[in-house]
């Protein structure tokens, strides 16, 4: 029996043929993909012909214009040039339509469109599918289940805990005054708001502001903020597998692990405590139920409890949303008051007449500082903690001016653009608290620091209380002055940050009690 042996030349010929066939197949697939992208872009151009926008690159869209932390400045220019809405082209023929008109906002927020899957999904490895990312009936069930955690009776005792956390931060600032240099406040405020969340929502004993281990969690959250935002804008990081192989993907994985270790520890400690305390009625007689108690003890409509996965997702979501957005709000409020000393002093006079030296602040005080509240709202208008929120249209929509968008379009409700829209807010860059004076006329959707509609921020009242407590106690202790050498540059991340930090000079104010003692 003879055995045929392939010659090297024949073997090379076979390999060459396979490679040629593979190359042709790849070229064909690329051609098909290119045609699909072209046809999709043509469809989008036709669908958006009623919405003019600046010239864009055929492949990279407006990405290059918005890459160098200039997005907010660009949005302000587009708001002035293009009425109500403006398409923002991304790489590869993708587009999102920026909305910054209150009538447009009202239409979208009155619908039940899901969060945009394209960009929000990048948050899932970090915060899971909790209240922020869920859609449809599951979201509705979770929202209804969590609403009791934000009832007034639950929130009232939190005011004292908030004040305790703020005082720890202010004491630290007093110690740093001797260094005679401006203070970067965001990091301090972020640690304070995390401390507040831990005390109020998770009944943590002590203060994590003096616990160095908490710094790693704060850093992980800061890193994830930047990493997720950068990934959304990077055409090569959209695929999960490819992203996991990059340095940014590995960094994201490590940061997620740190964040999850923190929340897992919080959950396990509470589970052990609940087992010791016994039945629900016995627990209620001992103490108030907090956010974590309600999560662990609540049941879904079908009688089942939350799975460990769902539980961690809700805790991670609230941990992030409850401290990072509030930290942004407080930091920018303090900066706004530092740059407007007359308004700062008027707030201080109001707070001093109400609280004296601030030794005690309660729930009832929070509705008795109208001018301070006006200043807080005006700062939130200028510096909204969440610059924008996305929706993917589940059905076509027609706006009040007759223009329409088809199903499947991604819209970005630009809260920053809305708050800086000169047609909505005359002289939008001017700090004017009297925009929010009692009786002032406003469109119902002109001011949306906590979003709006059925998916508005569930912790809105909690956050507003914390903003008031932090502002009041800080103004009683310090005079705030800006650092003229480092003016903050707002940049859009998951929350509104400053590219170069928020640096303030602090001047210790005399304590009225100390003055009396000297007399």
Curated annotation (Swiss-Prot):
Expressed in liver. Expressed in S2 and S3 segments of proximal tubules in cortex and outer medulla of kidney. Activated by cytochrome b5. It catalyses: an organic molecule + reduced [NADPH--hemoprotein reductase] + O2 = an alcohol + oxidized [NADPH--hemoprotein reductase] + H2O + H(+); an omega-methyl-long-chain fatty acid + reduced [NADPH--hemoprotein reductase] + O2 = an omega-hydroxy-long-chain fatty acid + oxidized [NADPH--hemoprotein reductase] + H2O + H(+); dodecanoate + reduced [NADPH--hemoprotein reductase] + O2 = 12-hydroxydodecanoate + oxidized [NADPH--hemoprotein reductase] + H2O + H(+); tetradecanoate + reduced [NADPH--hemoprotein reductase] + O2 = 14-hydroxytetradecanoate + oxidized [NADPH--hemoprotein reductase] + H2O + H(+). Its EC number is 1.14.14.1, 1.14.14.80. It is found in: Endoplasmic reticulum membrane; Microsome membrane. Pathway: Lipid metabolism; arachidonate metabolism; Lipid metabolism; oxylipin biosynthesis. It is a peripheral membrane protein. It is an enzyme of class 1 (oxidoreductase). Belongs to the cytochrome P450 family. This is Cytochrome P450 4A11. It comes from Homo sapiens (Human).
């Amino acid at each position: 029996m003879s055995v045929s042996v392939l010659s090297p030349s024949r073997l090379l010929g076979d390999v060459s043929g396979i490679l040629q066939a593979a190359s042709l197949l790849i070229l064909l697939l690329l051609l098909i993909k290119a045609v699909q992208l072209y046809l999709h872009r043509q469809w989008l151009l036709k669908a958006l012909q009623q919405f003019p926008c600046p010239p864009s690159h055929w492949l990279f869209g407006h990405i290059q214009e918005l890459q160098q932390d200039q997005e907010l400045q660009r949005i302000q220019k587009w708001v002035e040039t293009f009425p109500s809405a403006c398409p923002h082209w991304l790489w590869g023929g993708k587009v999102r339509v920026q909305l910054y008109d209150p009538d447009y906002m009202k239409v979208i927020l009155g619908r039940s469109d899901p969060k945009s899957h394209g960009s929000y999904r990048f948050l899932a490895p970090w915060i899971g599918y909790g209240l922020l990312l869920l859609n449809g009936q599951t979201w509705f069930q979770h929202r209804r289940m969590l609403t009791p955690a934000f009832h007034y009776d639950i929130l009232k005792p939190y005011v004292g805990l908030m004040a305790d956390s703020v005082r720890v931060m202010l004491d630290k600032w007093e110690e740093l005054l001797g260094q005679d240099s401006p203070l970067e406040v965001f990091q301090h405020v972020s640690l304070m708001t995390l401390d507040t969340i831990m005390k109020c929502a998770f009944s943590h004993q002590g203060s994590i502001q003096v616990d160095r281990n908490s710094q790693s969690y704060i850093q992980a959250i800061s890193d994830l903020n930047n990493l997720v935002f950068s990934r959304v804008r990077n055409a090569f990081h959209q695929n999960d597998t490819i992203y996991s192989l990059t340095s940014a993907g590995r960094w994201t994985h490590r940061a997620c692990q740190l964040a999850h270790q923190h929340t897992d520890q919080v959950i396990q400690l509470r589970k052990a405590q609940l087992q010791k305390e016994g039945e629900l009625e016995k627990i209620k007689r001992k103490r108030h139920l907090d956010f974590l108690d309600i999560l662990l003890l609540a049941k879904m409509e079908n009688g089942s409890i939350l799975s460990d996965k769902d539980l961690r997702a809700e805790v991670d979501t609230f941990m992030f949303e409850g401290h990072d957005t509030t930290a942004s709000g407080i930091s920018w409020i303090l900066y706004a008051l530092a740059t407007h000393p007359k308004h700062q002093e008027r707030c201080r006079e109001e707070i001093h007449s109400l609280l004296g030296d601030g030794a005690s602040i309660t729930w009832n005080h929070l509705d008795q500082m109208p001018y301070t509240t006006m200043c807080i709202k005006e700062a939130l208008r200028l510096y909204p903690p969440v610059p924008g929120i996305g929706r993917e249209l589940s059905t076509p929509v027609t706006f009040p001016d007759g223009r329409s968008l088809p199903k499947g379009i991604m819209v970005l409700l630009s809260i920053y653009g809305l708050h800086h829209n000169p047609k909505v807010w005359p002289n939008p860059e001017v700090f004017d608290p009297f925009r929010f004076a009692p009786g002032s006329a406003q469109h119902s959707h002109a001011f949306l620091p906590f979003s709006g509609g059925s998916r508005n921020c569930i912790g809105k009242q909690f956050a507003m209380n914390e903003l008031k407590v932090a502002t009041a106690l800080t103004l009683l202790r310090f005079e705030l002055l800006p650092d003229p050498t480092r003016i903050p540059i707002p940049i859009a991340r998951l929350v509104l940050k400053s590219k170069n930090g928020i640096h303030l000079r602090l001047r210790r104010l005399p304590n009225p009690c100390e003055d009396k003692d000297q007399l």
